[in-house]
């Protein structure tokens, strides 16, 4: 069963529409669907809501610590409510998936994502669920003929808003991910994963 859903992003209006905040977009949508309001909760270092989703009580969290310190918020809430790593789902932007793709998986490395790296360090575990929301990679914007030796600026890419066509694809992927949330929250995470991946996300 999933008891805590975390969306990763950076705090501040200047980051709201940037690719790195895709995790926030998903949690914002979940809160809206539940009629819950995310409020600043200092003991959890983020915006927090307790929501009733699909008949289950679920904690929603958006760390306000900046991305590379996200673990501080996650571990504070997980310890307070005695939530196990396997009961946590972290939604985050994923460079290695194109816009329009979303994948669910349990465990694994950080893939260079500083938010995941910090969460794994604070939990002393990598065994939590990740919802990877594809944002594409800056190398995809470089003409193939010019890619050899090119060094795409990843930091600049993730801190910029997606193009309109990319945003539409990302929004569609988030909708597909939301459609499998009832299954995931009730603990049928493997089934949710198969549904999401089968639906072309």
From Swiss-Prot:
Repeat listed as a keyword: no
Cell location: Cytoplasm
Protein name: Peptidyl-tRNA hydrolase
Positions bound to tRNA: 15, 66, 68, 114
Name of the gene encoding the protein in the UniProt record: pth
InterPro entries: Pept_tRNA_hydro, Pept_tRNA_hydro_CS, Pept_tRNA_hydro_sf
Domain of life: Bacteria
Residue(s) at site: Stabilizes the basic form of H active site to accept a proton: 93
């Amino acid at each position: 069963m999933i008891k805590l859903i975390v969306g990763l992003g950076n705090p501040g209006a200047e980051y709201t529409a940037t690719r790195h905040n895709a995790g926030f977009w998903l949690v914002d949508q979940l809160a809206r669907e539940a009629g819950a309001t995310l409020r600043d909760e200092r003991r959890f270092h983020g915006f927090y809501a307790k929501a009733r989703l699909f008949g289950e009580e679920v904690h929603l969290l958006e760390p306000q610590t900046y991305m590379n310190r996200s673990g501080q918020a996650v571990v504070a809430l997980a310890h307070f409510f005695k939530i196990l790593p396997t009961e946590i789902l972290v939604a985050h932007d994923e460079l290695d998936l194109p816009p329009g793709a979303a994948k669910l998986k349990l465990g694994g490395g950080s893939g260079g994502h500083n938010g995941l790296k910090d969460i794994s360090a604070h939990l002393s575990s990598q065994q939590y669920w990740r919802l990877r929301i594809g944002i594409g990679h800056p190398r995809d914007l470089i003409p193939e003929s010019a890619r050899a030796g090119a060094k795409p600026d990843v930091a600049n890419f993730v801190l910029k808003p997606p193009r309109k066509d990319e945003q539409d694809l990302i929004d569609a992927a988030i909708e597909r991910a939301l459609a499998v949330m009832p299954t995931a929250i009730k603990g049928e995470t493997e089934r949710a994963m198969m549904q999401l991946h089968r639906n072309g996300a």
